[in-house]
Amino acid sequence: MKVVITRPKERADVFASLLKKEGFEPIIFPTLEIVYNKDLDVNLDSYDWIAFTSPSGVIGLYNILTENERENVKNKKIAVIGEKTAKTFKKYFGRDPDIMPNEYTAESLLREIKKVSKEEEKFLIPTTPSTRDVLKNNLNADLLFVYKSAEPENLKEDIKKLKELIAKDKFILTFTSGLTAKNFFKYVDDEFAEIIKDNYIVAIGPITAKVIEKFGFKPLIPKVYTIEGMLEVIRTLKER
């Protein structure tokens, strides 16, 4: 069975490898590109906390810092949205984060932060302009746009080609963010939409699922909001 991976190319390989091991045929079809902003300065001394809502936020901040500033990050209180972001933070900055919620959403992260932070403490959130405002609106926080999400060139035409490639077989579409889903479904024509409804969609979590539902589709959601959680759902579809 074919499984379409719509996450950015540089983050698709791990998911593709997991799918291959399970006997699926992964198709890497990015509907999003990550573009890092390297022309930024930040005064880390102004902040008590740094909160990361994606691995790209970790990488983006690392890219703009000097060696001394990277060491300084280790002395900050660190909050991350989920397991992959935690692993990325440890890979780049050499230690575990202080906070990670059990449910990988901004709302859950905010609840955990509120339990241990003080009202006067200042937060830095390295993120993208398309980020949700949950943390910004509820914390004493500054956003630092260390990357942006761009739509790949010729995506509309490529989606037409994808339809021809997968239409005759059973397939699964996977989406790991609301933006990957939005960029995909806005170019889906009526014919492709009907084909998709006879197949399967797996969203990484409830926020991504809501975006998909706005386009009239009903995705499946894993219990754990990771690609490994998605794989658990995908395994069950193999038997159908």
UniProtKB/Swiss-Prot annotation:
GO terms for biological process: protoporphyrinogen IX biosynthetic process; uroporphyrinogen III biosynthetic process. InterPro entries: 4pyrrol_syn_uPrphyn_synt_sf (IPR036108), 4pyrrol_synth_uPrphyn_synth (IPR003754), UROS/Hem4 (IPR039793). Gene3D superfamilies: 3.40.50.10090. Keywords: Lyase, Porphyrin biosynthesis. Pathway: Porphyrin-containing compound metabolism; protoporphyrin-IX biosynthesis; coproporphyrinogen-III from 5-aminolevulinate: step 3/4. One of its GO terms (molecular function) is uroporphyrinogen-III synthase activity. It is an enzyme of class 4 (lyase). The keyword Hydrolase does not apply. It catalyses: hydroxymethylbilane = uroporphyrinogen III + H2O. Its EC number is 4.2.1.75. SUPFAM superfamilies: HemD-like (SSF69618). The keyword Lyase applies. PANTHER family: UROPORPHYRINOGEN-III SYNTHASE, CHLOROPLASTIC. Belongs to the uroporphyrinogen-III synthase family. Catalyzes cyclization of the linear tetrapyrrole, hydroxymethylbilane, to the macrocyclic uroporphyrinogen III. This is Putative uroporphyrinogen-III synthase. It comes from Methanocaldococcus jannaschii (strain ATCC 43067 / DSM 2661 / JAL-1 / JCM 10045 / NBRC 100440) (Methanococcus jannaschii). The lineage of its organism: Archaea, Methanobacteriati, Methanobacteriota, Methanomada group, Methanococci. The gene is hemD.
